[in-house]
Design a protein with these regions (language model features):
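Hydrophobic/aromatic beta-strand elements that line small-molecule binding cavities or substrate pockets
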Residues: 7-9, 61-68, 93-101
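Short, highly charged C-terminal tails/helix-capping segments
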Residues: 142-153
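Short beta-edge strand/loop motif at the mouth of beta-sheet-based domains
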Residues: 6, 26-61, 151-153
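Terminal, regulation- and interaction-focused segments at domain boundaries
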Residues: 1-15
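Hydrophobic pocket/interface hotspot
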Residues: 18-19, 28, 46-48, 66, ...
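A short, structured loop/turn motif at beta-sheet edges
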Residues: 15-16, 39, 67-74, 98-108
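Amphipathic alpha-helical segments
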Residues: 12-31
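Beta-strand/loop substructures that line and gate deep hydrophobic ligand-binding cavities in soluble
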Residues: 84-134, 152
Length: 153
């Protein structure tokens, strides 16, 4: 069995701008990840990485393949796998992110991550996932609405 994590946020930005924040490397590096590889097309890779030590020698990464890529409506990343610094892999999962204009200046961003395991190996990942997405979406809001990147970016 598996679980689904979902959250959403309305931001003052167009769907095009919000979509770009998730799919353009230079944007992702400002608010979400320490490293990114993004092939902007169906079948392209979507991969993000975060350092877990000050030297930047090890870390976490999440990698999958765009099963759908429909600017500015949304995208689906399939075969998503999370890897720890100890090389433990969790997956596969599916990540769906949608963008809907709710006014001329606002967009609803909906994040749905499916396939989150219930086995003990998933406990720490599952416990932090909803909180991590909520915090990341607030970081996205700060970037899109205020131009404020994460510290050190």
């Amino acid at each position: 069995m598996s679980q689904t994590i979902a959250c959403e946020l309305v931001v003052r930005a167009s769907p095009e701008r919000a979509f770009a924040a998730f799919t353009e490397v230079r944007e992702v590096l400002k608010w979400l990840a320490d490293g990114a590889v993004i092939g902007q097309r169906e079948g392209g890779r979507w991969g993000l990485g975060w350092y877990s030590d000050p030297e930047g020698t090890s870390g976490y990464n999440i990698v999958g393949v765009f099963g759908e890529f429909e600017p500015p409506l949304g995208f689906v990343v399939r075969d998503l796998t999370f890897t720890t610094p100890e090389d433990e892999e969790l997956g596969p999962m599916t990540l769906t992110i949608g963008f809907e204009a709710v006014s001329p200046e606002e967009t609803r961003i909906a994040v749905v991550q499916q396939g989150v395991g219930e086995e003990p190996a998933w406990d720490a990942y599952r416990a932090g996932l909803g909180i991590s997405w909520a915090r990341s979406l607030e970081d996205l809001r700060a970037w899109l609405e205020e131009g404020r990147p994460l510290p050190g970016r």
